[in-house]
Design a protein with these regions (language model features):
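Outer-membrane pore/translocation modules
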Residues: 88-185, 191, 232, 237
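Repeated loop/turn-to-beta-strand initiation elements of outer-membrane beta-barrel proteins
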Residues: 73-78, 124-128, 170-175, 207-211, ...
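Residue-level signature of outer-membrane beta-barrel architecture
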Residues: 36, 68, 80, 118-120, ...
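Outer membrane beta-barrel transmembrane domains
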Residues: 201-287
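Transmembrane beta-barrel strands of outer-membrane/channel proteins
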Residues: 30, 34-38, 78-82, 130-136, ...
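Surface-exposed strand-loop-strand hairpins of Gram-negative outer-membrane beta-barrel proteins
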Residues: 38-61
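Hydrophobic, lipid-facing positions within transmembrane beta-strands of outer-membrane proteins
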Residues: 30, 60-64, 110-114, 156-162, ...
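Outer-membrane beta-barrel translocator domains and adjoining extracellular loop/strand segments
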Residues: 42-50, 88-95, 140-148, 188-194, ...
Length: 287
C-alpha cells in the first residue's frame, strides 16, 4: 500500500493549476507563477475513510504555472513541476533517541499538465468555458529504494472540465464566484474520476490585496483494477476521494508583480494524506 498512497495528492497539485480557470486571458495577455508547494504527514485517510498513522512522509514541489491568451476565446495553460522531492524522515526511538529506520529522499521532474481553454459564452457578469487538460506522465512512478517515492503516477490522463464564473455585490462590496465540474479519464488501470469545485474571492486596497476561499471535491468511479490499499499515506494513489477546503492571499506590489500564500487541507477522504499543504509563490501579469 505504501506505493499506492504516495500517489494521491496529485489532485492537490492540479487544484492550483486551475486557480484562474474561469477568467480567460485576452489575446497577448498572460498570468505566470513560480511556486513552492509542501506537504508533510504522519497520518492518512484509509480506503474506508478512517485516519491511521504512518511514518512521517512528505513531498516538496517547485513548479511553474502559465496561462496565455492565443485569442480572446482561446487560452493555453501549463503546469510544470520541474523539481519534486518525495521523502521519508528518520524513525527515532522516543525512549533511547536511537535511529530505528533511516530516512530516504528521491528527487526528479514531476508530472506535467498541459491544457487548452475555450470560451463558451460571456455576457454581462457571467462567463462559461471548457478546458481539455492532458496529464503527462513525466515524473517517476517507481522512485526510491522500494519504488514508493514517486514523483508521478506513470499514467496519461485526459480531463474535460466545464467552468462557470460570475461577479456579484455583497454589503456594497464586489466579489467573484467560480465553479467547475469535470471528468478525468485515467489509464493504466487507474479508476476514472469526477471532480468539482467552488471558489469565492474579493479584493481590497484598490485591487492590490486579493483574498479567496475554495473547496474541491474528487470522487472515484472505482472502475480501475489497480490496488488502492496503502498503509503509509500517499499523493498519487488509485481510488482517491476527498473534500478539501483552503484559501489564498495575494498581494500585488506593482501592477504586474505580486506574491501569494496558500493553504489547503482535506476535511474528509480516502487513500490520501490527512495533513494540510502550503504554497508560496511569485506571479507576473503580462499585459
Amino acid at each position: 500500500m505504501k506505493k499506492s498512497i504516495i500517489l494521491s495528492l496529485l489532485f492537490v497539485f492540479t487544484c492550483q493549476f486551475f486557480t484562474h480557470a474561469q477568467w480567460l486571458e485576452k489575446k497577448g495577455n498572460g498570468y505566470f507563477k513560480l511556486s513552492a508547494w509542501s506537504l508533510e504527514a504522519d497520518q492518512h485517510y484509509t480506503n474506508s475513510g478512517k485516519i491511521d498513522p504512518n511514518a512521517t512522509r512528505g513531498v516538496f514541489n517547485l513548479n511553474l504555472y502559465g496561462k496565455y491568451g492565443l485569442s480572446d476565446n482561446w487560452n493555453v495553460i501549463a503546469y510544470i513541476p520541474f523539481f519534486v522531492k518525495s521523502y521519508q524522515n528518520h524513525q527515532v526511538s522516543s525512549v533511547t533517541n536511537e535511529t530505528l529506520l533511516e530516512g530516504e529522499a528521491f528527487n526528479s521532474f514531476g508530472d506535467m499538465d498541459l491544457g487548452i481553454e475555450y470560451r463558451l459564452f460571456k455576457k454581462s457578469k457571467h462567463a462559461f468555458s471548457t478546458i481539455l487538460t492532458l496529464g503527462i506522465p513525466s515524473g517517476d512512478s517507481k522512485g526510491g529504494s522500494d519504488g514508493s517515492y514517486q514523483t508521478g503516477d506513470g499514467e496519461f490522463n485526459q480531463q474535460l472540465r466545464f467552468n462557470a464564473g460570475t461577479s456579484f455585490s455583497l454589503f456594497k462590496h464586489s466579489f467573484y464566484g467560480k465553479s467547475y465540474v469535470g471528468f478525468n479519464n485515467k489509464t493504466k488501470n487507474f479508476s476514472d474520476e469526477v471532480k468539482a469545485g467552488l471558489e469565492v474571492g474579493t479584493s481590497f486596497v484598490g485591487g492590490k490585496l486579493l483574498l479567496l476561499a475554495r473547496s474541491n471535491m474528487v470522487r472515484s468511479l472505482k472502475n480501475g483494477s489497480l490496488n488502492a490499499s496503502n498503509n503509509n499515506g500517499s499523493i498519487f494513489a488509485n481510488n482517491v476521494e476527498f473534500i478539501s477546503i483552503g484559501g489564498e492571499v495575494a498581494w500585488k506590489f506593482t501592477k504586474k508583480l505580486g506574491l501569494s500564500l496558500g493553504y489547503h487541507s482535506a476535511i474528509s477522504g480516502k487513500v490520501i494524506y490527512a495533513a494540510p499543504s502550503y504554497e508560496a509563490g511569485i506571479f507576473y501579469l503580462l499585459k
